[in-house]
Amino acid sequence: MQFTIFTHLTMALSYAVPILIAVAFLTLVERKVLSYMQARKGPNIVGPFGLLQPVADGVKLFIKEPVRPTTSSPILFIATPILALLLAITIWIPLPLPFSLTDLNLGLLFLLSMSSLAVYSILWSGWASNSKYALIGALRAVAQTISYEVTLAIILLSVIMLSGNYTLNTLATTQEPLYLIFSTWPLAMMWYISTLAETNRAPFDLTEGESELVSGFNVEYAAGPFALFFLAEYANIMLMNTLTAILFLNPSSLNLPSELFPLILATKTLLLSSGFLWVRASYPRFRYDQLMHLLWKNFLPLTLALCLWHTSLPISYAGIPPHL
């Protein structure tokens, strides 16, 4: 019994720790990319080429005294950052890298439901702070996240229609002859832009305007709890880019040795994440009405039409005689 518990704990840790290490170094990559795009050097003091900067930042944040507003809800104020990071790590469970921790039959639905639950951590953190600025920021963030989840769900449904299964492992078999990005490129473009909005990245970073005096829902957070929110945000960025690679650029595990699969997937994830950083360095922030107009007036009708199109394709092909 004890051995079984130890094995399960080791498996969970071996899954979570590499994600957290990757997240830590993604922050360094972001700072380096932004600095070079602004013609400056970026972090280069702590360690060789600044490689130990994420470690120094983490140590500094976690040894600081966590300041809590006197009027806040104490339990919920501390619980929400923990919940945010827990959900950000848990959502990786069904991803085939090339083997998933748990091969779920409804893996894509699990991803959708877990990403929807992440909204509660934002809402509760804004409410628990007992600050009107934090609450307004949280409500704005929740509205943005829920809105763009509609598009993501419809795009996922279209991909499911083409792959014929809710499991993520099937996508490797589906994309063996051709990547789905070639046959569904309008969906892939809208998916990528929607993931930018879903993860609250520039130019959709209305949730957490770092250049503003009041940054958003996490304005009252400092030290350790703030670091947990930060880790959760970057873990979600890594997750969304890994999911994009699996959905539209999946290297087929049937033709590759299992050792090469994670390397190729990680390379594609890094390139997609670099796109996120490039966009942040290049584009100004959207106005809130433009953000909502883009989704409800542009993306939603397009994704609904394409979903109907992709639903009709398998039915149409099933009616074609085999000799044609």
Swiss-Prot record:
Keyword flag Transport: yes
Coiled coil: none
One GO-annotated biological process of the protein: aerobic respiration
Recorded catalytic activity of this chain's protein: a ubiquinone + NADH + 5 H(+)(in) = a ubiquinol + NAD(+) + 4 H(+)(out)
Pfam families the record matches: NADHdh
Regions crossing the membrane: 9-29, 75-95, 106-126, 142-162, 177-197, 228-248, 259-279, 300-320
EC number, as in UniProt: 7.1.1.2
Keyword presence, Translocase: yes
InterPro entries: NADH_UbQ_OxRdtase_su1/FPO, NADH_UbQ_OxRdtase_su1_CS
Membrane topology: Multi-pass membrane protein
One term of GO molecular function: NADH dehydrogenase (ubiquinone) activity
Keywords for this protein: Electron transport, Membrane, Mitochondrion, Mitochondrion inner membrane, NAD, Respiratory chain, Translocase, Transmembrane, Transmembrane helix, Transport, Ubiquinone
Compartments (UniProt record): Mitochondrion inner membrane
GO cellular component, one term: mitochondrial inner membrane
Group of enzyme by EC: translocase
HAMAP family: NDH1_NuoH (MF_01350)
Assigned protein family: Belongs to the complex I subunit 1 family.
PANTHER family, A to Z: NADH DEHYDROGENASE SUBUNIT 1, NADH-UBIQUINONE OXIDOREDUCTASE CHAIN 1
Role this protein plays: Core subunit of the mitochondrial membrane respiratory chain NADH dehydrogenase (Complex I) that is believed to belong to the minimal assembly required for catalysis. Complex I functions in the transfer of electrons from NADH to the respiratory chain. The immediate electron acceptor for the enzyme is believed to be ubiquinone.
Designated name of the protein: NADH-ubiquinone oxidoreductase chain 1
Organism: Struthio camelus
